[in-house]
Amino acid sequence: MNDFTLNAQVRSDLGKGASRRLRRNAALVPAVIYGGNNAPQSISILAKDFAKLLENEASFSHVLNLNVDGQNESVLIKALQRHPAKGFVLHADFVRVVAGHKLTATVPLHFINQETSVGVKKQGGEILHNLNEVEVSCMPQDLPEFIEVDMANVEVGQVLHMTDIKLPKGVELVALAHGSDLPVANVHAPRVSKEDAPKEEDAAE
């Protein structure tokens, strides 16, 4: 069993009441698998195993192996419903990954060279992240665990857009395919405090 494998079992007792009983009595997370050429399938997963998997950021952008009563399913995490106060998972949606067909998935952005960025180190600016993740389209074998955004040469006042990101081979950004070149990050000038602001008499001189 690797880090991206989960054991699951088919569930036939459906509905909100059944889901509550699963979570309360058996510490199981109710979930559903859909997509591909097969019908949706309701399953349950051990809550502690799922929680451990989710500790790894890569689990959200990695093809997972679901072992459902001995039958393997390649899936992606599509959506999680969490408890509003305690944060644990109440329900999960998985979408099937079909070999030979492109998939869409949300991938985290990793920003590198921030402290040594021209706009920060030489110009005293501050970096602001507009996005922390992006939706990508690619073949299953090309799905990256994360995408790097290099901030090394970004200056104060400069905005980095999606078209500025160097993408891994075979990976496309869904937003760009729809004509939206969204801002990803920028370096803005440092805020000037009242103490540092020039006084009126100084400005008059």
Curated annotation (Swiss-Prot):
Q: Note the CDD domains from the entry.
A: Ribosomal_L25_TL5_CTC
What SUPFAM superfamilies does this protein map onto?
Ribosomal protein L25-like
| Organism domain of life | Bacteria
| A Pfam family the protein falls into | Ribosomal_TL5_C
Q: What keywords are assigned to this protein? A: Ribonucleoprotein, Ribosomal protein, RNA-binding, rRNA-binding
Please verify whether the record's keywords include ATP-binding. Answer: no
InterPro entries assigned:
Rbsml_bL25/Gln-tRNA_synth_N, Ribosomal_bL25/Gln-tRNA_synth, Ribosomal_bL25_b-dom, Ribosomal_bL25_C, Ribosomal_bL25_long, Ribosomal_L25_dom, Ribosomal_uL5_bac-type
GO biological process terms held by the UniProt record: translation
Q: Which GO terms describe its molecular function?
A: 5S rRNA binding; structural constituent of ribosome
Mention any one GO cellular component term assigned to this protein in its UniProt record.
cytosolic large ribosomal subunit
Gene3D superfamilies for the chain: Ribosomal protein L25, beta domain, Ribosomal Protein L25, Chain P
- Complex and partners: Part of the 50S ribosomal subunit; part of the 5S rRNA/L5/L18/L25 subcomplex. Contacts the 5S rRNA. Binds to the 5S rRNA independently of L5 and L18.
NCBIfam families recorded for this chain? bL25_bact_ctc (TIGR00731), PRK05618.1-2 (NF004128), PRK05618.1-5 (NF004130), PRK05943.1 (NF004612)
Provide the family line: Belongs to the bacterial ribosomal protein bL25 family. CTC subfamily.
Q: Please give the PANTHER family that the UniProt record associates with this protein.
A: RIBOSOMAL PROTEIN L25/GLN-TRNA SYNTHETASE, ANTI-CODON-BINDING DOMAIN-CONTAINING PROTEIN, RIBOSOMAL PROTEIN L25_GLN-TRNA SYNTHETASE, ANTI-CODON-BINDING DOMAIN-CONTAINING PROTEIN
What this protein is reported to do is described as: This is one of the proteins that binds to the 5S RNA in the ribosome where it forms part of the central protuberance.
Name listed for the protein in its UniProt record: Large ribosomal subunit protein bL25
Q: What are the leading ranks of the lineage?
A: Bacteria, Pseudomonadati, Pseudomonadota, Gammaproteobacteria, Pseudomonadales
